[in-house]
């Protein structure tokens, strides 16, 4: 099960009826000059959901790969994100991203980080609601929003976020936050779904990989998928891209899902949204 030529990727229906492929491809830290080639490889492997951000500085490469692919636009799901330093000018920032991507519309637009010290994410959200109303975005959401950020945003929002993209992997699951989002009707999307590779060496994961003839990454991604979580693993290697996509064919038992869940250790791999500023992003 290490590779797959044709894998049916499940979808998640967002709270506005839009369907998002549950297993996507992320381009965080992919160099701009390599992005087109890498995204072309991902599209050829079978990915139809691509996740980028203005802060990654590789939207143009994503757009070039889309244009070169010949894949009908309606078959693709493209996510990008609002830069932290542009929360006060979200409308123009979105137009810049859309043009860099070479697209008439974007499927999902996220506030990348709350940056509460700026006090601007509610203003940004109101601007995004207008873009959504004008049909330039099919769904709007947030990223890295903790419970208190949601508590600030939701009373001022006319539109409920469709997605909250947060760090989740076996050793850092944010179970309470994920449950809160799901209870509100906000889909949960995991970045760093493999714990930046650190979770793949766990004995439980390696044992299940041997049992299923799968890669450790496929086991961890299957664990995410079993819980309805959207995932966006990244790789710069075409073979690994195909392997990761094959996770959709791995079905774990409830007991095996629980075994992986027991790996929780509170080991955050990325920045803490409560204090992260990243104003330069």
Residue map of PLM features:
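Acidic-and-aromatic substrate-binding clefts and catalytic sites of carbohydrate-active enzymes
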Residues: 30-33, 53-61, 83-90, 116-119, ...
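Glycine/small-residue-rich loop that forms an oxyanion/phosphate-binding "nest" at active or ligand-binding sites
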Residues: 81-83, 87-126
């Amino acid at each position: 099960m290490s590779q797959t030529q044709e894998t049916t990727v499940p979808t998640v229906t967002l709270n506005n009826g839009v369907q998002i492929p549950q297993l996507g491809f992320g381009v965080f830290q992919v160099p701009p000059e390599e992005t087109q080639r890498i995204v072309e490889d991902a599209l050829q492997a079978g990915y139809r959901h691509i996740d980028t951000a203005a802060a990654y500085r590789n939207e143009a490469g994503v757009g070039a790969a889309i244009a070169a692919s010949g894949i009908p636009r309606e078959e693709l799901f493209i996510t990008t994100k609002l830069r932290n330093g542009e929360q006060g000018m979200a409308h123009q920032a979105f137009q810049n991203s859309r043009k860099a991507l070479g697209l008439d519309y974007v499927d999902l637009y996220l506030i990348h980080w709350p940056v509460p010290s700026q006090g601007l994410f509610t203003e940004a959200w109101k601007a995004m609601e207008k873009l959504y109303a004008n049909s330039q975005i099919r769904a709007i959401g947030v990223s890295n929003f903790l419970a208190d950020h949601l508590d600030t945003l939701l009373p001022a929002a006319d539109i409920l976020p469709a997605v909250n993209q947060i760090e989740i992997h076996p050793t850092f699951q944010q179970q309470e936050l994920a449950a809160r989002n799901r209870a509100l009707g906000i889909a949960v999307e995991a970045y760093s779904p493999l714990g930046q590779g650190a979770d793949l060496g766990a004995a439980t994961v390696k044992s299940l990989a041997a049992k299923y003839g799968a890669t450790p990454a496929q086991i961890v991604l299957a664990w995410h998928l079993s819980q309805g979580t959207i995932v966006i693993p990244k790789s710069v290697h075409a073979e690994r891209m195909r392997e990761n996509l094959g996770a959709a064919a791995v079905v774990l038992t409830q007991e095996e899902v629980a075994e992986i869940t027991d790996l929780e250790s509170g080991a955050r791999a990325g920045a803490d949204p409560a204090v992260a500023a990243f104003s330069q992003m």
